[in-house]
């Protein structure tokens, strides 16, 4: 009986390969150019695959038996029957056994239409079944497709093989060990890539993403603009929110959509960027410089006398009656609407309190 000691016997001859040679064949190449030629006793492209009876060794002994390889090793191996009259292969090894995982996968030719072989994945278990301990050693076993009786040539007799323990003269096996460390390295690379992507995101978008968790209940509400028409006394401009974005309007239309804390710069006026309440950082300050020629919202004549509850705050100079407007609006809003939000006019009334310098939302 052949010794199971990997140190016994001379090492297999090393193939004469050019520098930089790598052996990474596809499944089709392994079956067509190596296994099929080996079964037909035809010359191989290169003598790089050793002939070893894998089931007489434990998997950690096999790298020393290989002709070539560093992380994975290839072998031609015979396959025996488990029982003389059965078709099941014998998977027992020296100190354990190989267990198949999943179903056989067909190996197709490059055109994708012809089946040239079968691939089976196996895992090595130490001990005796069924209480074996699963290891990290993996085997991919390639075998040729079986010849159907109607495809066998006339006069071909396999009677001598029926009573033999030999199931296949040759199968081709790839052996490797799963490396948990490499998987951790791959995960670290994924995390590094995610961090790199987030570092490339502008701070305004990052802050917006961080604050979305505080406003998940608004996601089922229409994303249309929450527009509150009204008129302000004195020079200034209007601010409103549409759920995730804060926009500034002048008399002609939108000047800036500042999201949660973005910044825009143009000409002449200062404005405070709004930031949703969160623990991610202090309030962001933004400067908006632009000449605002019209101090009022564009409203129709019939809306000039609209009730204070349908007006919104202006921010800027001369806002003498802004606090009165805020007080009136809060007084006329039902308590439930003040707590949870409700429909006011055509939009959603948001009661989120923003700390704006010089402006008291709840002053009477």
Swiss-Prot record:
Q: Which UniProt keywords apply?
A: DNA-binding, Nucleus, Transcription, Transcription regulation
- GO CC annotation: nucleus
Induction field: By Jasmonic acid (JA).
Q: Where does this protein reside within or beyond the cell?
A: Nucleus
Where in the numbering of this chain does the NAC domain appear? 17-178
What role does this protein play?
Transcription factor of the NAC family. Together with NAC018/NARS2, regulates embryogenesis by regulating the development and degeneration of ovule integuments, a process required for intertissue communication between the embryo and the maternal integument.
For domains, the record's comment is: The NAC domain includes a DNA binding domain and a dimerization domain.
Which positions does the record tag as DNA-binding? 116-184
Protein's UniProt name: NAC transcription factor 56
Give the organism the record lists: Arabidopsis thaliana (Mouse-ear cress)
Start-end of Pro residues biased regions: 9-18
Q: Where is this region: Disordered?
A: 1-23
Q: Which gene encodes it?
A: NAC056
